[in-house]
Amino acid sequence: MPLIVSQATQELQALARQMSPTLIHILDSSISPALLKALAQTPPGAPWYGFTRITEHLADDDFCLSLKRGGCAMLKLGIESGNQEVLDQLGKGIDLPTASAALKALKKAGIATYCYFLFGTPPETQESARKTLDFVIKHQDCINFLNLAIFNLPAASIEAQSLATSDFYEGDLSLYKNFSHPAGWHRSLVRNFLEKTFKKHPAVGKILQSTPDFFTSNHAPFFFLQ
């Protein structure tokens, strides 16, 4: 059962006093705006980071500055796509103008960003994937790290019921299914686009080059501790 916000901040402060951590990783699948606000008002006593959704709160300069003062070193953000139509069809609830404003506000506040983008989803095409490239190029100065992933179709998902699916191999017991992309934007084409177009762009390459081998999102905030 989730902790109430006040209890969460009190326990974080108690643990920080007891353990004297260099960095706190908040493991919520998505830190709520209410908890973000509480962390800004009642800092845990050590730098912290975690995953959160793009909301209007993050598009506010003053709110982001308060997060920084409260110890926020980095936020992991699932933007997923730079094409609004794709986001809407996926039901992500993400508004790209808000995402743009949030990235700029976080940059201004001195909070690092680790941004996640997903390619090869059923509503995506190569053209809309290029919109994602355009989005990253436009916000290259506000994105510190990138995670670029190819979509895996969960076998029990609603999407799987409306797509032509198949096992990856005979006797496949995995949680995911291979599928025929409705627009022909198959995994091999997506992978080729990522490797030969997306990652080759100088703006993207510069961000990726700042990520050492075997480096994960849990190493990233250490580069931004003050």
Enumerate the predicted regions with their spans.
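C-terminal accessory regions of radical SAM enzymes
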Residues: E127-Q226
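Acidic/polar loop patches that form or flank catalytic/metal-binding clefts of enzymes
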Residues: T22-I24, Y114, I143-L148
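Short strand->helix junction
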Residues: H57, T121-P122
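Hydrophobic, well-ordered secondary-structure elements that form the walls
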Residues: L67, L77, C115, V136, ...
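Short, electropositive alpha-helical surface patch
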Residues: L36-G45, K107-K108, T125-I143
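Radical SAM [4Fe-4S] cluster-binding motif and immediate context
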Residues: M1-A112
